[in-house]
Amino acid sequence: MNCEREQLRGNQEAAAAPDTMAQPYASAQFAPPQNGIPAEYTAPHPHPAPEYTGQTTVPEHTLNLYPPAQSHSEQSAADTSAHTVSGTATTDDSAPTDGQPQTQPSENTENKSQPKRLHVSNIPFRFRDPDLRQMFGGFGFVTFENSADADRAREKLHGTVVEGRKIEVNNATARVMTNKKTVNPYTNGWKLNPVVGAVYSPEFYAGTVLLCQANQEGSSMYSAPSSLVYTSAMPGFPYPAATAAAAYRGAHLRGRGRTVYNTFRAAAPPPPIPAYGGVVYQDGFYGADIYGGYAAYRYAQPTPATAAAYSDRNQFVFVAADEISCNTSAVTDEFMLPTPTTTHLLQPPPTALVP
């Protein structure tokens, strides 16, 4: 009888030790389903009844309690290795909770296993890699191997205050560079220059503009030769037809129309040059005159035939792009504009048209 009591007492003490080991793990919730134990043994499992004999109590606790503890440690070790970031050790911030072993298999998808990068803004300027590692704790660096860890770090650290600065943790996205095309408010390819307030046309070409000064023979006003021709390569309008040329020749000077009469065509128009374009100023001072940017300047001495053709009066005539035009009517100051190009002339004329 004494031996039987000692054996029974020893079996009861041996059965109490595994119960104390199983209490921190709270294995009553998930250990029985893993080992296939029926549901009726789940409730009396932590507290065995005293009427059980030694032969039945000891094998039950020996076979049922220790294997769940070992499988639980293996599973927690696997979870810990899954959450470990390369180059850093995990801390209690990233340790799995009691409910994670049940939900972890559902979260381990292909998207969750891909690396994920977080963008942390508004952090102190003195922060370096050790500071970031200390701030993120067990999450390691900002670049995570597991997308679930990155999401958990973002939810935990977003909006926190570090040294008086509220940091923001968001998902880093790839920056896409796009070439935005400017909207042209004008039709037919005309473009507006906001600096000078002018409208440029893409259909202008670099033609030749002749500013002819024809002096009367024996005039005492000028001591220069009988005729000077000021030539400059300048963008002008292409004149494909007479109707279009007539429309452009009726350009306004200070709101007034000026008709240019043709005498003869000098040569065929040169090919278009897209780099240079004519310009129509919309400013009130210039009116709606048609101007052109200069590409080069040069002086040329005209032939005697050209000098004789322009020797009837003292005036400057604006010649269109592909033709030499002279105004046979009297040119007065009413139709003239101050020209900024008078410094390029050999001799200042009494009046001048602005090209």
Swiss-Prot record:
Gene3D superfamilies: 3.30.70.330. One of its GO terms (cellular component) is nucleus. PROSITE patterns: RRM (PS50102). Keywords: Cytoplasm, Methylation, mRNA processing, mRNA splicing, Nucleus, RNA-binding. GO terms for molecular function: mRNA binding. Residues 70-112 have a biased composition (Polar residues). RNA-binding protein that regulates alternative splicing events by binding to 5'-UGCAUGU-3' elements. Prevents binding of U2AF2 to the 3'-splice site. Regulates alternative splicing of tissue-specific exons and of differentially spliced exons during erythropoiesis. Binds to the C-terminus of ATXN2. This is RNA binding protein fox-1 homolog 1.
